[in-house]
C-alpha cells in the first residue's frame, strides 16, 4: 500500500510540474487556447483525480 501511495504522490508531483509549465505556454500562444483547450481540461481533471487518490490512500495508510 505504501508503494501505491508513493507512486500516486509522484504522479501528482509530475502532473503538477507539467501543468505548471504547459498552462502558461498555452495561454501565451496566439491560437493556443482554442486548439489545446481539451488537453488543459484533461490535465486538470487528472490532477484533481490524483489529489483525491492521494487523500484516500493517505487515510488508509495512517
From Swiss-Prot:
GO terms for cellular component: chloroplast thylakoid membrane; photosystem II reaction center. Keywords: Chloroplast, Membrane, Photosynthesis, Photosystem II, Plastid, Reaction center, Thylakoid, Transmembrane, Transmembrane helix. InterPro entries: PSII_PsbZ, PSII_PsbZ_sf. It is found in: Plastid, Chloroplast thylakoid membrane. Disulfide bonds: none annotated. One of its GO terms (biological process) is photosynthesis. The keyword Membrane applies. The keyword Cell membrane does not apply. Pfam families: Ycf9. It is a multi-pass membrane protein. The chain crosses the membrane at residues 8-28, 41-61. Belongs to the PsbZ family. May control the interaction of photosystem II (PSII) cores with the light-harvesting antenna, regulates electron flow through the 2 photosystem reaction centers. PSII is a light-driven water plastoquinone oxidoreductase, using light energy to abstract electrons from H(2)O, generating a proton gradient subsequently used for ATP formation. NCBIfam families: PS_II_psbZ. PANTHER family: PHOTOSYSTEM II REACTION CENTER PROTEIN Z. PSII is composed of 1 copy each of membrane proteins PsbA, PsbB, PsbC, PsbD, PsbE, PsbF, PsbH, PsbI, PsbJ, PsbK, PsbL, PsbM, PsbT, PsbY, PsbZ, Psb30/Ycf12, at least 3 peripheral proteins of the oxygen-evolving complex and a large number of cofactors. It forms dimeric complexes. HAMAP family: PSII_PsbZ (MF_00644). This is Photosystem II reaction center protein Z. It comes from Magnolia tripetala (Umbrella-tree).
Amino acid at each position: 500500500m505504501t508503494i501505491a501511495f508513493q507512486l500516486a504522490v509522484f504522479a501528482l508531483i509530475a502532473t503538477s510540474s507539467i501543468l505548471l509549465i504547459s498552462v502558461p505556454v498555452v495561454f501565451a500562444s496566439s491560437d493556443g487556447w482554442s486548439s489545446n483547450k481539451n488537453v488543459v481540461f484533461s490535465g486538470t481533471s487528472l490532477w484533481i483525480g490524483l489529489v483525491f487518490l492521494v487523500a484516500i490512500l493517505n487515510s488508509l495508510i495512517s
